[in-house]
Amino acid sequence: MSLYEMIGDIPLFKNFSEEDKKAFAKMDHSVLAFSKGDAIIKEGENYTSLFLLIRGSAQVTRKGYDTPVALLKAGSVFGEISFLTRRARQSNVIANENILAIKIDDSFFAKLEPAMRDNIKNYLIELLANRLDSMNEALSKIAKYARGYAVL
């Protein structure tokens, strides 16, 4: 299967024209393979690459917590906080199985046509807004559950 075929239905590319998808797929970029258990991102690292999971699944974890924060599947984007803000990584991303991911670093991003860059940035803004909405909903449920319990 070609990279163009793999990215065809991925949400990040929903506002790309077919020509832009083809151009993106032909560009010289890093498609990386990871094995089950590999750390794709490590909490505290100062790397700023964005990743697009094109095959497989991974879990997001935080140091000091046993429960995964999120499950990523094909089509998921991760590393966006560091990519946009240049802050250190805030979590770990661990491969649940053998996966393929596209790595988008600053030099690759700079080579994209302005319309492609804008589409990616707009998608990341929408993604972050949706994640914030989900976290606010979860916090509201926790707060509702915690009412009536004394804080010691």
Predicted regions and their residues:
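Cytosolic regulatory regions built on CNB/CRP/Popeye-like sensor folds
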Residues: 1-152
